[in-house]
């Protein structure tokens, strides 16, 4: 799968540096039976790859990921931008990387009938998807407030992208990667200043 092929062969990931990281890393996935977000602690990227895979398994597109007898899908269904969890964990400074531009408002899901049918055994998935736009928009308002109060530093695209959730056009993906890299580079000095402030 891409979760092994890319980091191990195509674009080797620096596993050694990650293993030396002193902080805590998490991935968030949605338990499709309970509808609750689950925050998996990531200690070893190779061993914990299914926890990462679960956090990015989109409804209708990906298979459910089974971990310890439970099934999971993308964390964005139940907690799209887990800043609140980070704050509750005691983090005073947070870096939030957004994939949408300032002013973006998520609209209601258009595939609800299909989602209800596909996840008939898991009604919480359809329920979450039905309210996802409301929760997402509330989270972005929370992020803006946290940014104003200095508890969050936000990196986001300057403009709307033209890349879909399941984009396969390599040139579009490369262009989006470059744009994201440039957006982060532009605010690097400001970010370093934010991190050094007490």
Stretches found by the model and what they are:
Residues 1-198:
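Patatin-like phospholipase
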């Amino acid at each position: 799968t891409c979760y092994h092929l890319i980091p191990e062969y195509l674009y080797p990931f620096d596993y050694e540096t990650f293993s030396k990281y002193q902080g805590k890393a998490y991935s968030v996935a949605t338990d499709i039976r309970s509808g609750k977000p689950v925050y998996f602690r990531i200690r070893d990227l190779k061993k914990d790859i299914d926890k990462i895979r679960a956090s990015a398994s989109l409804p209708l597109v990906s298979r459910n990921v089974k971990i310890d007898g439970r099934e999971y899908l993308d964390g964005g269904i139940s907690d799209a931008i887990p800043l609140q969890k980070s704050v509750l964990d005691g983090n005073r400074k947070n870096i939030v990387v957004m994939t949408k531009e300032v002013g973006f408002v998520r609209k209601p899901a258009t595939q609800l009938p299909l989602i209800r049918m596909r996840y008939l055994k898991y009604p919480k998935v359809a329920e979450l998807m039905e309210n996802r736009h409301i929760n997402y928009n509330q989270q972005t308002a929370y992020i803006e407030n946290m940014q104003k109060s200095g508890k969050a530093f936000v990196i986001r695209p300057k403009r709307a992208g033209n890349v879909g959730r399941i984009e396969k056009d390599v040139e579009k993906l490369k262009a989006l990667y470059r744009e994201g890299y440039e957006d982060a580079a532009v605010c690097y000095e400001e970010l370093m200043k934010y991190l050094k402030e007490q």
